[in-house]
Structure formats: structure tokens, C-alpha cells
Amino acid sequence: TVGFLDYSEDVKSKDIVSAAKEGYDSSELAKRFTTSGMGPAQGKFENVNAMAILAQATNRDVQSTGTTVWRPPYAPISLGALAGRVFEPERVSPIQRWHHEHGAKDMVAGQWIRPEHYGNPAAEVVNVRSNVGIIDLTPLGKLDLHGPDVVKLLNLVYTNNWDNLAVGSVRYGVMCAEDGVVMDDGVTGRLGDDHYLMTTTSSGAGAVWDWLEMWLQTVHPDWQVTVTPLTTAFCSMNIAGPNSRELLSRVTDIDLDPKTFGYMKVRTGTVAGVANCIVWRIGFTGELSYEIHVPASYGLHVWQRLLEAGQDLGIAPFGIEAQRILRLEKGHLIVGQDTDGLTQAYQAGLGGLVKLGKDDFSGKPELVVQETMAGDHSHLVAVETVNPNLVPPEASQIVRNGNEIVGRITSSRMSPTLKRSICLAHVPAALAAPGSRVTIVLENGDRVDAIVREDLAFVDPEGVRLRG
């Protein structure tokens, strides 16, 4: 008896014979002596042959030799039959009950249960553009940074420069892994000389905290920085729309004059009678907006007070779906949707935030290489389908020369503001120039044409609204 018996465990027929000679002449002992049947197949492929060889080596028949105990599954089954519920903590905002009482449809966003919409996402978008909307942002990751070396840490983990951020200002930043791949983004505000508040993506809060601690504990243990996670310590909300300043002025003692509290600024004060609230002026939706962080136990109170104060201003809540449409209209990317595990900063259109002139930072060597490519890489661009009523599914492939896959649609929606289809896509450099025509393959195999836009923003590319 010669030849391989169990390819996965590298067992030959002669190994079974050797087992019998050594006294391991029962089916279970021979199995363990040789490891035959202990690989991925768990004996389904080889054990019948193994027992036949053992029977021959011990001068018995197969029936009296017996077989090993079969391990489940006995017969092939689909992985779907084995898949169970993902056991993760379900986290909710302090305002969750209010959302349910007012018709919110839930969606799962990482570990969080969040309002997807309140019945009509398109109407929610229109209301934000025309009046004022309010959204629950509690899942937004929040990290408190204290210490004289915070700026060193920010310069290390972000691609842009943090040396000149003044107290009372906030700055958008992008984090890259050491291979230059975009791993998270967010806004960090300077609350005091050595005091900063960092926000991250909702799904990236834990990973960013780990990332900061990794650098502090393994590379720079001498730096004086204390990082405290505050995601659930604050209830966060954003009011957005042309009436948002008037609304906030009715419930706060903070001076909202745009000359003193301009775009990308932060202030601390009282909101709806609650002290020590942090308010910063940023614009993910593309509208004049204020992001408010209040102690979690007061979240529902502040939320309801804002709704009461804004009744004559047309205030209404909006959910994640409306927010995604609004940000797409503005051309703002979402890390993890408009990027993937290979997207580097320049490919995501974030080259303006990469400051290669500063000291070493995470991802710098790889980004230096990409910068020398002079744009010869994939690009994130805005595209419009020739048919304004056709919304290509996200992840639809972009092809050229027949069937060569060269890109994909990363985000797509029907814009209630523009009343047409709008998309973001990754395309090669040859197709990234404004006016380029690209071919999108739909799920049914149909092909449609789209045109690359000059600007990522479909609405207010000059930023007049959010800076108003």
C-alpha cells in the first residue's frame, strides 16, 4: 500500500501501516498517531480508506476494524446554516425612546441603533436646506485629550499640521495607517492651552482610542498626554439649516455673532439651561450648523428644548439617511464607504490635508511615494449619470474597453435638492478629468454613461451656506 492518504495532513498509506506495527491498531489510536482525518475534512474524505488500510495491516476486515467517531457536520452544509446572530453590545442614545415615540425607523450602525429616518428622508433633506433640522449624533466618537504633549500626538496621527491651532478653533483631520491608507477622520477642537476634544467616526471610536494608546504606550511613553473616551459621557446633536443660528440663539448664552463665532470655531457655554456644553460650528451637511455636546443625562432635555424653541422656524428631526444625502450633495466623503482598505489619502481626494513638510507621522513614507506619482493613481470624483433619473447601485463597477474593471461607484442617491441622481466614484487618473465619460455596469448587466464633474460638491461648492 503506497501513496498519499490525507493530503491536508500529509499522511501516506505507509504511516497507517507504521501505526499498526507500533501497536496503535485501533481506529482511534491510528488516527491520532498519524493525524489522518484531523485536517479540514475531519475524516470525510480519507477515513474510510484509512480504516481499510488499517484492516489490511492487522489482518482484519473493515467491519471489525471499525471507524473513528464522526464529527459534525456529517454531511456538507452551507455556511449560512451555521451563521448565527452576531453577539455585540447594542448601544443607544439617551434620546432613543423619543425617537421611537416620534416614528423613527431604526437602523444598525456598528454597535449603535440609530434613527434611519422619520418617515420621509427626502422631505427631511428639503427641510434642512430650507429651514432647520436636528439630528442625534451621540454615537460620534469623542476622546478628551489633556497634557502638554497633545500637539505632538495630533501631529503624529493626523496627516495635517496642528502646531498653529488656536484655542477656540477646530480643525478637520485625517488619520492614516502606516501604509498610508485612510483609517479615520474627524474634527478636533482646542478647548484650552493643553485641552482638546477629538471626534472620530462612530464606528472608529474604539479603534482610534487603541491607535492613540498604542503610540503613547509603545513608542512615546515619555509624552505627557491623557486620553479619556467620552463617547457615552456626552449626548451629541447637530442643528443644521439656514435657521440654525436663530434657533440656537434662543436657548444659549454663547455669542453666536459670525464675526466672533465663525466657521470651524468652538465655544463652551450654557445651552437650554445646561452648563458646560461644548458647541462647535462645522458643516458636514453643507449648511450653517452647530454641533452641540451636552452631558448625557441632560441630552433629552436639551433635544426637546431645541424642538420647542424652533417650532416657528420649521424645525424637524432628520435621520442618518437624510444626513448621507446631504453630505453627498456637498461632496463630503465617508470613511469606509468612499474609501476601502487600500485607499490612500491622495486617492480619496485628501491630498490637501497631507503636509509632507512636517516631522514624521503615521503613513508619511507611503504618502511621499504616492505624492511623487503626480496624480497617476485612482481618484475620488463626483459623477452624474446622463439619465438624471437613474441611480446606479453603490458598488456598481466602472469599466472601459469592454470589460476592464477600472473603478466603482462608492455613494449614490437621488438628490431631493437637485432632483437628479448624484454619485461619488473611484476612477483611474485617465478618467478623472472633468468632463470625462465613464461607463457604469448595472446589476442586470446594462451599461449606462456618466460624466465626471469638476467639483466633488454638487450643492454650494463655494461653501457660502456653511460659512454664512
List the predicted regions and their residue ranges.
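Acidic, proline/glycine-enriched N-terminal capping motif
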Residues: 33, 49, 53-176, 181-183
